[in-house]
């Protein structure tokens, strides 16, 4: 019997830094692990600044969403982790650009992040019908 949980992968999907999947698909829902502002080829942070990392994060997030059969306008909920709330205004600007259509629910928290990362976003999205 096939598993009800499908692991999402693809050429443009960044490799995770631990023993977890970039995303899983269950029926019409896509559960995306925390994506970060890393270069998908090297796994290293895409720069030292918040803006650089956030822009790369949104490129990575879009790649994972598309690999799982979804898109930004179908994201229902996000969990945003930032290393410093001083970037909150810039986060709002970039978040609004990426989710310009049907902005999702969002929870934002300040937490320490590993490996020089400044932001991480996980989400739940609907799969295109």
Question: Predicted regions: what is each one?
Answer:
Residues 2-129:
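Short, polar/acidic, helix-capping and beta-turn segments at strand->helix junctions
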């Amino acid at each position: 019997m096939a598993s009800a949980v499908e692991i999402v992968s693809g050429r443009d999907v960044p490799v995770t830094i631990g023993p977890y999947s970039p995303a899983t698909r269950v029926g019409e829902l896509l559960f995306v692990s925390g994506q970060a502002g890393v270069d998908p080829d090297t796994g290293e942070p895409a720069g030292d600044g918040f803006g650089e990392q956030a822009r790369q994060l949104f490129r990575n997030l879009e790649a994972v969403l598309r690999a799982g059969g979804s898109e930004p306008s179908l994201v229902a909920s996000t969990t945003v982790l930032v290393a410093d709330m001083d970037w909150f205004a810039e986060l709002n600007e970039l978040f609004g650009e990426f989710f310009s259509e049907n902005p999702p629910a969002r929870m934002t928290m300040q937490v320490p992040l590993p490996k020089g990362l400044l932001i991480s976003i996980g989400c739940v999205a609907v799969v295109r019908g």
